[in-house]
Curated annotation (Swiss-Prot):
Annotated function: Catalyzes the attachment of alanine to tRNA(Ala) in a two-step reaction: alanine is first activated by ATP to form Ala-AMP and then transferred to the acceptor end of tRNA(Ala). Edits incorrectly charged Ser-tRNA(Ala). Incorrectly charged amino acids occur because the of inherent physicochemical limitations on discrimination between closely related amino acids (Gly and Ser) in the charging step.
Cellular compartment(s): Cytoplasm
Annotated SMART domains: tRNA_SAD (SM00863)
Recorded consequence of changing Q633M: Significant deacylation of correctly charged L-alanyl-tRNA(Ala) occurs
CC terms in the record's Gene Ontology section: cytoplasm
Enzymatic reactions: tRNA(Ala) + L-alanine + ATP = L-alanyl-tRNA(Ala) + AMP + diphosphate
Gene: alaS
CDD domains found in the cross-reference section: AlaRS_core
Protein name from the UniProt record: Alanine--tRNA ligase
Gene3D superfamilies: 2.40.30.130, 3.10.310.40, 3.30.54.20, 6.10.250.550, Bira Bifunctional Protein, Domain 2, Threonyl-trna Synthetase, Chain A, domain 2
GO terms (BP aspect): alanyl-tRNA aminoacylation
Keywords from the UniProt entry: Aminoacyl-tRNA synthetase, ATP-binding, Cytoplasm, Ligase, Metal-binding, Nucleotide-binding, Protein biosynthesis, RNA-binding, tRNA-binding, Zinc
Subunit (UniProt): Homodimer.
Length: 915
């Protein structure tokens, strides 16, 4: 679809619409002689060495200039909004915030929640991995950048501003505030689509650099049954009009600072506090500035994902500056590595400060990718500097603007240090892994490691393709690393899977029903109630009101009975479909629409769920205070006997930490703090309590239920809770588990369940005391004494076993039979698999075959290097005769037979092979 993008300013101020002679796209300009749109590769950078803004700005100065301009605008004052975390806790469809508009998707865009201000202005740190392979090379690409933006949400009947005003505001900011030359600014028409939305858009270009994008979001993805007269096609996808029309702008903070300084790259302009120290550490010689400038000018027109080959760029730059490609590579490569390290470590600082824990999954995977890529770059530079030292430079520089960096500094640096140690261990183990894979490829006659194998090495074992290449080339095997390797694996990691639950009842059969009145919220202590039957569908009964809690948020459903005409019918499951609650019953035939039934909750089950749910919130507060603010809930589940809480944490929780957590949680219980809950508009709740609200994951709806423990914990939660912490009863941590990389599981019990666990422990202590005939307080020293005595006895047993083995070897040697040039030993003996394996190892000689079978059916075989068969072939023959299974290497094999009565037949059969 082609949009007509004529604005008031273009018409009134003499702007001309032209078609770019290079790319053919339409653009608007004040310059009648202009023939190109201003966008690379149609135009080169024209500001390097000649800044396009009269005065130099720092990041802080440019950010404040932008925010203040929109905040204080006379006609359109905007509400200033603080940055959102780069880890978007309010949504589950993306891993990281990649643009300012993502702060307001889906709730504000859909109209389910009000924006924090309308219109608003924000400077949002954004992280994108799509360009990771361009970072350091093009001079303009970053994984971390700040998207300065002004947004307006035009709800039906409540317009704010649209295309005319947006273009005028942008032009006013650039020309009046930053003093850019109007005739050098172009507005290029380029429809935008992303995140399920689309609309017409302008790219604002100035002297070869895109400095802003102005999107007019007015379409959403079309459903399959959308009316055809409403459907428009944008970039090959079908869309329909949105009710809310959104002004979605993005101004590149780093690019504007770069424009004001005219440095060879944007990295020099905004990351100098890391770039310069790294240059000194690496001892990099200063190169001719002309090389850097020409490299940047051409690199600005280059995209690895498009051209795919860095060599092409090198050739063009080398030709322009009059040196060889090799000379250029030698001069420019260290700079590119340093720029990439500076960018990646800044992205890491934001990610870790906002709660990302490095791991093998989701955002943690992307953090680990940055860490390992940065370490690899440092290694290529020959630098031994710890990565944590570089991250510390970012914290030192940025903490005044982002005070949370200083608060999290110790944890951020410890996470990085631990990751560096893990990577060193990965490399140590990984070398053998790569060599084994190379051996397999060589056997098949393959002389190059395929790309999919490089991806497996990276994703499953943490081995970067550069490391694999280094090892492979020593073994004579080729490795071609795709130029876009890292953006390729990051793209795969960023895909989020949509989980669809089982459909219990067809929603179409429920959509005409009113929302179920939730009595469990009105009175969480309601044990009995009366309600009217609205519908019966298969085994499910729908009531107009219920005190039965439906499964959700980690809390199991309630059970109990519905009493019909004096008869109790069991309720075995309760679920929520939309805003309707459905009850599974044992005898659905007993229910008729319109009848009144009496419900009774299994109170013993419910109250224990309430104890465990409130206890989960108490424990979460203790975990954050003891372990740090990086701790976030990664899942939870309640039962009547125990509860579990999964948290993000970068190492195992120590015993001392567990004691402190448990003590702190129980102190809050004993203080009997108030637990309150209220329904708040989503935006109000976020502004009041921050994004730590979303501990339990994304909570849908315009209004969210906020559960608050007095001065301790606040979460958006739909569960049933106790009115004070004292009712939780004692909290006992039973154990912790490492369920996956970066996630700790705490299993605990509250109230009666905790008391039962203490009673179990007391019974075990009593039993152990009775066995050892000592009082419980003497158990540790008695157990230690017994253990030491057992160790001494074990040493004696081992000595005797070694002596017996020596005698057995001597005896077996004496039974050796000569068959031609081969020595053969075959016997049935006593011993474990381990014993047999040790014996055949000791008896092994170049021209000898040894077959030993134990009376328990274990067997071991050894074959000398000068014997013409392999041990694993003999193992197959043994199991063919006596059943069972086994296998091994060329020289040693082992296994177990099913039929021990055939042991002698086996030995004779093997012996006959050499007769």
């Amino acid at each position: 679809m082609e949009f007509i993008m004529k604005t008031r300013m273009f018409e009134e101020e003499g702007w001309i619409r032209k078609k770019c002679k290079v790319c053919g796209k339409p653009f608007w300009t004040l310059d009648p002689d202009r023939e190109t749109c201003g966008d690379p590769p149609c135009d080169e950078y024209q500001f390097i060495g000649k800044p396009g803004i009269p005065r130099k700005y720092t990041l802080d100065e440019m950010r404040e200039k932008f925010l203040r301009f929109f905040e204080k605008h006379e006609i359109y004052p905007h509400g200033r909004v603080k940055r959102y975390p780069v880890l978007p806790r309010w949504r589950d469809d993306v891993l990281l915030v990649g643009a300012s508009i993502m702060d307001f998707q889906p709730w504000v865009i859909s109209g389910e929640a009000d924006p924090p201000a309308n219109p608003l202005v924000i400077s949002q740190p954004s992280i994108r991995f799509t360009d990771i392979d361009n970072v350091g090379i093009t001079g303009r690409h970053f994984t971390i950048f700040e998207m300065m933006a002004h947004h307006a949400f035009n709800y039906p009947g409540k317009p704010i501003y649209w295309m005319d005003e947006t273009v005028e505001l942008a032009f006013e900011f650039f020309t009046k505030e930053l003093k850019m030359k109007p005739e050098d600014i172009t507005f290029k028409e380029n429809p935008w689509a992303g995140g399920g939305n689309a609309g017409p858009a302008f790219e604002v270009l100035y002297r070869g650099l895109e400095v802003a994008t102005l999107v007019f979001m007015q379409y959403k993805k079309a459903p399959e049954n959308a009316p055809q007269d409403q459907v428009v096609v944008i970039k090959g996808e079908k869309y329909i009009p949105m009710e809310t029309k959104v002004v979605d702008t993005g101004y590149g903070l780093e690019r504007l600072v770069w424009m004001s300084q005219g440095t060879p790259t944007a990295y020099d302009a905004v990351l100098g506090y890391v770039v310069e120290p790294l240059k000194k550490m690496a001892g990099i010689e200063k190169i001719d500035e002309k090389i850097l400038m020409e490299n940047s000018r051409l690199a600005g027109m280059f995209d690895i994902e498009d051209l795919g080959d860095l060599r092409y760029l090198r050739e063009q730059v080398a030709k322009r500056v009059g040196i060889t490609v090799e000379e250029l590579e030698k001069a420019i490569r260290p700079y590119e590595l340093i720029y990439a390290i500076a960018d990646h470590t800044k992205a890491l600082t934001f990610m870790l400060a906002d709660g990302v824990v490095p791991s093998n999954v989701k955002a943690g995977y992307l953090a680990r990718l940055l860490i390992r890529k940065s370490i690899r770059h440092l290694r290529e530079l020959g630098l031994e500097v710890p990565l944590s030292e570089i991250v510390a430079l970012h914290i030192k520089e940025l903490h005044k603007t982002f005070p949370e960096f200083k608060e999290m500094e110790d944890i951020i640096l410890e996470m990085i240090e631990l990751e560096e140690k893990k990577y060193a261990e990965t490399l140590r183990r990984g070398s053998d892994l790569v060599r084994r894979e190379i051996a397999k490829l060589k056997k098949k006659g393959i002389k190059e490691i395929p790309v999919e194998k490089l991806v497996t090495f990276y994703e499953s074992h943490g081995l970067t393709p550069e490391i694999v290449k280094e090892i492979a080339e020593k073994e004579g095997v080729k490795v071609n690393i795709p130029d876009n390797f890292y953006s390729m694996v990051a793209k795969e990691a960023e895909r989020t899977k949509e989980e669809k639950g089982e459909e219990l009842v067809d929603f179409e059969l429920l959509k005409d029903l009113p929302d179920t009145r939730r009595l469990y919220y009105e009175d969480p202590f309601m044990k009995e109630f009366d309600a009217k039957v609205l519908r019966v569908i298969k085994d499910w009964v729908i009531l107009d009101a219920t005190a039965f809690y439906p499964e959700g948020g980690g809390q199991p459903y309630d059970t109990g009975v519905l009493i019909v005409n004096g008869r109790e019918v069991k309720v075995t499951n309760v679920q929520k479909v939309g805003k309707v609650i459905i009850h599974k019953v044992e005898d659905p035939g007993a229910f008729k629409e319109g009848m009144i039934v009496h419900g009774k909750i299994d109170w013993k089950r419910r109250i224990q769920h309430m104890r465990h749910h409130t206890g989960t919130h108490v424990l979460m507060g203790a975990l954050v205070r003891v372990l740090g603010r990086h701790v976030w809930q990664a899942g939870s589940q309640l039962t009547t006997d125990w509860a579990r809480l999964d948290i993000s944490h970068y190492k195992r929780i120590s015993e001392e930490e567990l004691k402190e957590i448990e003590m702190l949680a129980n102190r809050i219980v004993m203080e009997d703090r108030k637990v309150t809950w209220e329904w708040l508009p989503r935006t109000t709740a976020e502004q009041k309590y921050g994004f730590r609200l979303y501990q339990g994951g994304v909570v849908p709806g315009r209004e969210i239920r906020v559960v608050k423990i007095e001065d301790w914990d606040v979460q958006a939660c739909g569960g049933t809770h106790l009115p004070s912490t004292g009712l939780v009863g004692p909290i006992k941590i039973l154990r912790t588990e490492r369920i996956q990389d970066g996630v700790e599981r705490i299993i605990f019990a509250c109230g009666e369940a905790a008391i039962r666990e203490w009673q179990k422990e007391r019974d075990l202590l009593k039993k152990a005391s009775n066995v050892l005939r000592v009082p419980p307080e003497k158990l540790p020293e008695t157990a230690e004494r017994f253990f030491n005595e057992w160790k001494e006895a074990r040493k004696e047993v081992d000595k005797l076993k070694k002596e017996l083995a020596r005698l057995l070897v001597y005896e077996l040697e004496s039974k050796m039979q000569k068959i031609g040039s081969i020595e053969f030993i075959g016997e049935v003996v006593e011993g474990s698999m381990e014993d047999l394996r040790e014996l055949v190892e000791k008896l092994k000689k170049p021209k000898r075959v040894v077959v030993l079978i134990s009376r328990d059916g274990y067997f071991a075989v050894s074959v000398g290097s000068e014997v013409g068969v392999e041990a694993n072939e003999l193992a197959k023959k043994i199991t063919l005769i006596a059943g069972g299974g086994g296998g091994g290497r060329r020289d040693i094999a082992q296994g177990k037979v099913k039929d021990i009565s055939k042991a002698k037949d086996v030995i004779e059969s093997i012996k006959s092979m050499f007769s």
